[in-house]
């Protein structure tokens, strides 16, 4: 059957702006064409003959675009001559092509649905890829920030620990110094305690001796009584018979300077022979009466 056409490329109007929307498949087993796409366009142009089972259409999608391979069987010269001078204003004859689907509208719906599903799947895949990439970047940033934060916290903690260690060492040294000071103070306290106990014992002894001297002085009838022998001592070695301990009052004045009244008792000979000034002198070592070495002296209040 001959169809008048004005264009040699009979499939020029089959090419859609969206190349993924048009797909021709050839069913070689049934000898039919399966078309999945939009509405079937009108074929116009120069006259040529198309056999239903002779035409082959292969549309393959490549990376660079769409490539078409269409083979048209040779037309007979007679048929071309018959239709070469046909009236150009004559109505265009259409040829129906056998399709597997029932109607073009269903094909359009299925094609649109398939395109939408494909686009939706591509969008979902793209969104999933971008989401995964963004998640990886966020995780990497979080890990980097976490490491930086951990490093900063570790540095601060290490600095604080070093300061605490230094403070512990300083306090430990100070504690050792204080312990040594406490030990020295304890030893010094013991020494002073011993000295205090010794001085207290000496004071008690001197107080007892003073009480005895004062008691003996009260037994004399008058303070002007003198002993005939100035060299006589009250020591036990000087008293041959009785061995009693008596105080010997030598004259009324000081045996060293002779100017003031004798008010200092010399021990251990117990001669009341020195005044207050001579008794407090550090140069006097012996008793001026008996020349006995002095080990102590007692001031006696002679006022009544």
Swiss-Prot record:
Tissues where this protein is expressed: Expressed in leaves, siliques, roots, flowering tissues and stigma tips.
Q: Which UniProt keywords apply?
A: Apoptosis, Coiled coil, Metal-binding, Nucleus, Plant defense, Transferase, Ubl conjugation pathway, Zinc, Zinc-finger
Its chief place of residence is: nucleus
For the keyword Coiled coil, the answer is: yes
Substrates-to-products reaction catalysed = S-ubiquitinyl-[E2 ubiquitin-conjugating enzyme]-L-cysteine + [acceptor protein]-L-lysine = [E2 ubiquitin-conjugating enzyme]-L-cysteine + N(6)-ubiquitinyl-[acceptor protein]-L-lysine
Pfam family name, one: zf-C3HC4_3
- Say which domain of life the source belongs to: Eukaryota
Instruction: Summarize the subunit comment.
Output: Interacts with MYB108/BOS1 and the DELLA proteins GAI, RGA, RGL1, RGL2 and RGL3.
Annotated PANTHER family: E3 UBIQUITIN-PROTEIN LIGASE BOI (PTHR42647:SF54), SBP (S-RIBONUCLEASE BINDING PROTEIN) FAMILY PROTEIN (PTHR42647)
Q: What else is known?
A: Shares anti-apoptotic activity with IAP family proteins. However, it lacks the baculovirus IAP repeat (BIR) domain, which was shown to be essential for anti-apoptotic activity in other IAP family members.
Q: What's the protein name? A: E3 ubiquitin-protein ligase BOI
Lineage of the native species? Eukaryota, Viridiplantae, Streptophyta, Embryophyta, Tracheophyta
